[in-house]
């Protein structure tokens, strides 16, 4: 049972109480102080000090100072008045226990409020930090977008300058051709004048030298007329024999029928043009060419302007939807923009158009399988992705990059991927 301490001293003013409590040689580390507005307890085993205060105090602003084996309390009163005693008198044990329990509940509620306030402050700090990070990321994203836009504008200007240069060069060549044609026409006129002058000179000379030789004069004049008027061109026909296409394939592995079918499909794809598009009337002549649009999309892809590249491929596909490379290149753009389902659709369409499988389209089919497999893996459909990678390896078994990626996918599926 602890020993009650009674040899304390206290003083007061209208606003504060100063309490001095001796520690009796007990180490400061073993001292526990508990204070509320109506209750003060100091536990330093084997001693105990307990005071049921005469009036409420401001326990948040009150202070305790330890020094010289003594604790000095400065207790600020809530109401400015002089106390008759430090602790209330005539209090029974039940009242004391009730005051203790009430003080403990108040302390617990304050601790809970302080914890909630601290958590709220922490959430506010995290929210503020998140908003700052989002703002920084937004600025970085805007900076990157501005850089991309500047690069796109630069590429567009360069393309327009190149087209203007080509137009001027074509005009210059046209002017040169017209000038050469005019010069040739002038030369022909001069030659005709010279021939006419020579014929007149010969006629006059023949009259003067041989006035009686009518027959000889007629012979020379007829010969001169024949020389001055060119004979009409003879009609002829030219027969052209094309060299047959020979594929470098062994006879036992020959795919002549498939290769001929593939060449036939390519020829049909080049002829398949859809000109019934309303926007075509606003386009230049070269912009109506799917090959030119494909090259333009490739240049935009190289400058990381993927949306503009997709627009170029879209128009090219509207003009000619039989070219597999348009779908294959658009799938690469969708992969960069994380449009994974569209990348899968375009890769599948490219594989449909790359039939029958021959050596000439092997590289394109391998790329289509890899891009579709990559999209499947990013959608966490690893089994489907591995199937595409294995199909790509069947086409090109010596591709080391595809081999490494396929092995990684197998490890993910088996749940044994090595930690890097």
From Swiss-Prot:
Its main location: nucleus. It holds the Pfam family CS. InterPro entries: CS_dom, CS_DYX1C1, Dynein_assembly_factor_4, HSP20-like_chaperone, TPR-like_helical_dom_sf, TPR_rpt. Residues 7-103 are annotated as: Mediates interaction with ESR1 and STUB1. TPR repeats lie at residues 290-323, 324-357, 366-399. GO terms for biological process: cilium movement; determination of left/right symmetry; epithelial cilium movement involved in extracellular fluid movement; heart development; inner dynein arm assembly; neuron migration; outer dynein arm assembly; regulation of intracellular estrogen receptor signaling pathway. Gene3D superfamilies: 2.60.40.790, Tetratricopeptide repeat domain (1.25.40.10). Keywords: Cell projection, Cytoplasm, Neurogenesis, Nucleus, Repeat, TPR repeat. The keyword Nucleus applies. Residues 3-87 form the CS domain. It comes from the Eukaryota. GO terms for molecular function: nuclear estrogen receptor binding. GO terms for cellular component: cytoplasm; dynein axonemal particle; extracellular region; neuron projection; nucleus. It is found in: Nucleus; Cytoplasm; Cell projection, Neuron projection; Dynein axonemal particle. Interacts with ZMYND10. Interacts with STUB1. Interacts with ESR1 and ESR2. Interacts with DNAAF2. Interacts with CCT3, CCT4, CCT5 and CCT8. Interacts with DNAAF6/PIH1D3. PANTHER family: DYNEIN ASSEMBLY FACTOR 4, AXONEMAL (PTHR46492), DYNEIN AXONEMAL ASSEMBLY FACTOR 4 (PTHR46492:SF1). Involved in neuronal migration during development of the cerebral neocortex. May regulate the stability and proteasomal degradation of the estrogen receptors that play an important role in neuronal differentiation, survival and plasticity. Axonemal dynein assembly factor required for ciliary motility. This is Dynein axonemal assembly factor 4.
């Amino acid at each position: 049972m602890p020993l009650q301490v009674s040899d304390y001293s206290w003083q007061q003013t209208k606003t504060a109480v100063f309490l001095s409590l001796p520690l009796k040689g007990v180490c400061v580390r073993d001292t526990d102080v508990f204070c509320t507005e109506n209750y003060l307890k100091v536990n330093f085993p084997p001693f105990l000090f307990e005071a049921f205060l005469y009036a409420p105090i401001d326990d948040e602003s009150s202070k305790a100072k330890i020094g010289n084996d003594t604790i000095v309390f400065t207790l600020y009163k809530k109401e400015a008045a002089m106390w008759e005693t430090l602790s209330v008198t005539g209090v029974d044990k039940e009242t004391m226990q009730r005051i203790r329990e009430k003080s403990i509940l108040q302390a617990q509620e304050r601790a809970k409020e302080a914890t909630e306030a601290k958590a709220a402050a922490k959430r506010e700090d995290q929210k503020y930090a998140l908003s700052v990070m989002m703002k920084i990321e937004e600025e970085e994203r805007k900076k990157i977008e501005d850089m991309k836009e500047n690069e796109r504008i630069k590429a567009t200007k360069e393309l327009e300058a190149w087209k203007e240069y080509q137009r001027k060069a074509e005009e210059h060549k046209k002017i040169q051709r017209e000038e050469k044609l005019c010069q040739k026409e002038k030369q022909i006129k001069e030659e005709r004048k010279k021939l006419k002058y020579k014929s007149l000179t010969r006629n006059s000379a023949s009259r003067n030298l041989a006035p009686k030789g009518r027959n000889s004069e007629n012979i020379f004049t007829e010969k001169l007329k024949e020389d001055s008027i060119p004979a009409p061109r003879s009609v002829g026909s030219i027969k052209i024999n094309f060299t047959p296409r020979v594929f470098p394939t062994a006879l036992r592995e020959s795919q002549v029928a498939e290769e001929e079918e593939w060449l036939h499909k390519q020829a049909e794809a080049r002829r398949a043009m859809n000109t019934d598009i309303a926007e075509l009337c606003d386009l230049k002549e070269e912009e109506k060419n799917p090959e030119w649009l494909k090259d333009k999309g490739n240049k935009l892809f190289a400058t990381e302007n993927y949306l503009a590249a997709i627009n170029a491929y879209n128009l090219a596909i509207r003009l000619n939807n039989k070219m597999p490379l348009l779908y294959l290149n658009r799938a690469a753009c969708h992969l960069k923009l994380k449009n994974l389902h569209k990348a899968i659709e375009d890769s599948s369409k490219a594989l449909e158009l790359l039939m029958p499988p021959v050596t000439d389209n092997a590289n394109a089919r391998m790329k289509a399988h890899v891009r579709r497999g990559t999209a499947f893996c990013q959608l966490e459909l690893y089994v489907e992705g591995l199937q595409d990678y294995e199909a790509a390896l069947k086409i090109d078994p010596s591709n080391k990059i595809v081999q490494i990626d396929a092995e990684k996918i197998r490890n993910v599926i088996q749940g044994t991927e090595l930690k890097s």
